[in-house]
Amino acid sequence: MSDLAREITPVNIEEELKSSYLDYAMSVIVGRALPDVRDGLKPVHRRVLYAMNVLGNDWNKAYKKSARVVGDVIGKYHPHGDSAVYDTIVRMAQPFSLRYMLVDGQGNFGSIDGDSAAAMRYTEIRLAKIAHELMADLEKETVDFVDNYDGTEKIPDVMPTKIPNLLVNGSSGIAVGMATNIPPHNLTEVINGCLAYIDDEDISIEGLMEHIPGPDFPTAAIINGRRGIEEAYRTGRGKVYIRARAEVEVDAKTGRETIIVHEIPYQVNKARLIEKIAELVKEKRVEGISALRDESDKDGMRIVIEVKRDAVGEVVLNNLYSQTQLQVSFGINMVALHHGQPKIMNLKDIIAAFVRHRREVVTRRTIFELRKARDRAHILEALAVALANIDPIIELIRHAPTPAEAKTALVANPWQLGNVAAMLERAGDDAARPEWLEPEFGVRDGLYYLTEQQAQAILDLRLQKLTGLEHEKLLDEYKELLDQIAELLRILGSADRLMEVIREELELVREQFGDKRRTEITANSADINLEDLITQEDVVVTLSHQGYVKYQPLSEYEAQRRGGKGKSAARIKEEDFIDRLLVANTHDHILCFSSRGRVYSMKVYQLPEATRGARGRPIVNLLPLEQDERITAILPVTEFEEGVKVFMATANGTVKKTVLTEFNRLRTAGKVAIKLVDGDELIGVDLTSGEDEVMLFSAEGKVVRFKESSVRAMGCNTTGVRGIRLGEGDKVVSLIVPRGDGAILTATQNGYGKRTAVAEYPTKSRATKGVISIKVTERNGLVVGAVQVDDCDQIMMITDAGTLVRTRVSEISIVGRNTQGVILIRTAEDENVVGLQRVAEPVDEEDLDTIDGSAAEGDDEIAPEVDVDDEPEEE
């Protein structure tokens, strides 16, 4: 076998494809398509600006040929095609592309009509003045430098920018599997937002939006509606509608109307827009236009659309908005590299990252300046000491045979401090002392010991420095350095002073480069949020066995005394009954869990509001349920918070835990919440913290209490684990996550119930048979539900006939676990209790109905406490 053949290594093509494509994807994401959140630049932009900085192609110097810069960039830093680099330069020099141009171009750099820029050999460029703020203090070790592609040059990993460039100029790019599209903003507004964040790091998105109301495009125009902006700033994703600025002018003589367009949306090609309008007129898809012309010139844009006599200008304009790019949507997707990883970021995340970057840059700059100041002060100290001892030093130098021996003698002898003593005493002996200085040098025992560097500086001292004027200048410079060192130490020693410096520099940038907003933001009808028109109130949500859903104000139900007959909650169809009941706020989300283990999401106010006697609407008309699929559990959620879990339990005793955020932003079709085996269904859902305890109650009166931590969090499309070991024919009827002390109220089919302290229920292991929760007999019937209550609470019970009663919890006695309970609601023959719900809102005494709560003899008695041996636990 040849040498070449021995170098061939067989590889699995599938593994090689995975590895190579992943490498390619990460290279595109990190090295090409996405900007860094700190400086808002992609690598190619950063390399172009750095190359121009190295060339000295500054804003106040002569222009240089674009080809010269492109050659430096591709030769030293960016080993790609010259067209990619030149296109980047062109875009940074176009006033209609960047809100604040980073390159000052001379020549033809294209137009808003889509005209191409002239070749790079014809155009000339230099850095814009604002671009220097991106690279300010670059030479002061403020950022890390990394090797270029071949290791022959160093380039900055990120720019030490004073400008929040990611927001100010925005960014767009398509990577592998992700993309970014960040709109530009007004510099003054963004800096105001940064200052507000510096003042209060806990500021909300709404608070930041008081300073940054929305994007500010270089082409001005109008943003139609605020809702997309709010969503984008809150979540990192959103959509805004940009509309051209147009007005309808009326000729005073003829009465004819003319539409004048002064500004068009961002990234819209004006020439193509005019072609599209002409095409629509030709195809008669837009009526009422008699003439179209472009009168734009160096003074501004002006597109003239003449309207026919019998047409209405506003109607024609609205048609153009809907059918042309006079109105476009801008999809905001704020993805940037954060710590080297792509991340979708909201407005506060981006500002926080920039301020954090500035804190690091200013700290590193201060350390650098302190080191340089101390090094300079170290030399000035020696010169001041030399001037204080000028005669003996001159004598020593005159008698030294060589400069080397003179230096050695200067280092060996101690010297009087002279004027330096007072200055060092005021500033502190160690203030100007370099960190590298050994202890034997400097001030010791009232004398000054020179280092070799200081001795050399004395030998290099020119004779003119011995004049009185030069002596004073030297001492003044030394005093200024001591003051500078003191200030630098104060910055490093005080976080508040550090933030003051950052604030002062941001205010200076705002003063120098800030301007007025160009883009107007207007409200539109779509901004009238239905939710804003809905009064926040607590309501009762009911779901019948046959799937009829509705909500009613909680205030419609008056609390009644125990044993009352209740009021009708719903007009029920024959053979139907209410089996799901909860109290929620009209603005809450409702997570609807179905018999097939899927979950759907709605707002409470989207449910039908009905009177007490109405059935409501079939939930199949509100949710895309499949045939034979029904809602078996509903859960109100106010906010989808991080760290909160959704705990689920099924009738067969299976339990499962999933993070709440898995259920945010559900699609209309819903998603799988839990995989169910045949014959099982979901009976209970609750929110947990991850460290709670869980109680499962069965129809036969058993309960198991165990720690939630024994169930690990799982994804949506999983089955879960066993929570309780059930007897034959038994099923789980309630899931409770006990919070605080309180008591557990258990209700049975025949209207009986009782309260038992939570502490009475022992904590056992998961997947055991549990202990007795209530004594189940023929008299009280099987358990239909259990809830945790406090003395100030009320409960609502509902029967399969639709009767609902609301009762004070305080009227129900607290007894042990092994009892039957008392009558909570009187049921008619063949009527069973099917639902139980806690109400945590007290009602004034004036609003209560006085209903005789006395019971027939024996009915109200609490079954005596009976010693019942709990069944042994089974692991």
Curated annotation (Swiss-Prot):
Any single biological process term in GO: response to antibiotic
Pfam families: DNA_gyraseA_C, DNA_topoisoIV
Keywords (A to Z) from UniProt: Antibiotic resistance, ATP-binding, Cytoplasm, DNA-binding, Isomerase, Nucleotide-binding, Topoisomerase
Residues annotated as the enzyme's active site: Y122 (o-(5'-phospho-dna)-tyrosine intermediate)
Record bears the keyword Isomerase: yes
Regulation acting on activity, per entry: Gyrase is the target of many classes of inhibitors, including coumarins, cyclothialidines, pyrrolopyrimidines, pyrazolthiazoles and (fluoro)quinolones. Quinolones bind GyrA when the enzyme is complexed with DNA and trap the enzyme in a covalent reaction intermediate with DNA. Coumarins bind to GyrB and are competitive inhibitors of its ATPase activity. Cyclothialidines also bind GyrB and are ATPase competitive inhibitors; they seem to act differently from coumarins. Pyrrolopyrimidines inhibit both GyrB and its paralog in topoisomerase IV (parE).
Effect of H78A: Nearly abolishes DNA supercoiling. Reduces quinolone-induced DNA cleavage and DNA relaxation
Catalytic activity: ATP-dependent breakage, passage and rejoining of double-stranded DNA
Start and end residues of each stretch annotated as Disordered: 841-875
Domain Topo IIA-type catalytic: 34-533
Domain of life per record: Bacteria
EC number: 5.6.2.2
UniProt GO cellular component terms: chromosome; cytoplasm; cytosol; DNA topoisomerase type II (double strand cut, ATP-hydrolyzing) complex; membrane
GyrA-box, short sequence motif: residues: 560-566
Domain comment in the entry: An N-terminal fragment (residues 1-523) can be reconstituted with GyrB, but the complex no longer has negative supercoiling or ATP-independent DNA relaxation activities, although it is capable of DNA cleavage; ATP-dependent relaxation is inhibited by novobiocin and non-hydrolyzable ATP analogs. The fragment has ATP-dependent DNA relaxation and 30-fold improved decatenation activities, unlike holoenzyme it preferentially binds supercoiled DNA. The C-terminal domain (CTD, approximately residues 535-841) contains 6 tandemly repeated subdomains known as blades, each of which is composed of a 4-stranded antiparallel beta-sheet. The blades form a circular-shaped beta-pinwheel fold arranged in a spiral around a screw axis, to which DNA probably binds, inducing strong positive superhelicity (about 0.8 links/protein).
Family: Belongs to the type II topoisomerase GyrA/ParC subunit family.
Function: A type II topoisomerase that negatively supercoils closed circular double-stranded (ds) DNA in an ATP-dependent manner to maintain chromosomes in an underwound state. This makes better substrates for topoisomerase IV (ParC and ParE) which is the main enzyme that unlinks newly replicated chromosomes in E.coli. Gyrase catalyzes the interconversion of other topological isomers of dsDNA rings, including catenanes. Relaxes negatively supercoiled DNA in an ATP-independent manner.
Protein name as catalogued: DNA gyrase subunit A
Species name: Escherichia coli (strain K12)
Taxonomic path: Bacteria, Pseudomonadati, Pseudomonadota, Gammaproteobacteria, Enterobacterales
